[in-house]
């Protein structure tokens, strides 16, 4: 996607292959603006026949292998998620929800080795996952972030290990799109209350998120 959302400006030039087969979502400051990339498998500028969306079917497992160690500037957050662009927040999960498989925000404090998982449908459920409690260090190496999705349950994983599960507000929509994004909101009132000013860390930019793959498996 392109344009402005919250306090970030999005360009197609800030998503590219790094020369080693990985996708890099870059974050940078240019002309006093925070610029990055927002990738989605739908577009209101394209016919729906060109969208890539899906539902739980007989059961899905969605996984991405991601490296967030290059995220250095405080304030922006990297995310891997599902989103139904039609009626996500109308309170009816059958019309789709926002399913956050991984949201990671750089912070010098307690959030540095934690990430967020969530499901939003008008109401919300979310959990802050302490990676260390599962033997993981987000500031080192690659990690896989996964979601097992059935019509009645969402189960969240890191490196194949379940970290949370919920049966509330589960989407049964067939129009959930895949999203890979870096977002920024200076606040107040967003960015989970951390409200860091990315321009105070401009010397650490450009930074970004590396993605090895995104895979969607369906139970037969």
Kindly label every feature range from the protein language model.
Residues 1-220:
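GH16 jelly-roll
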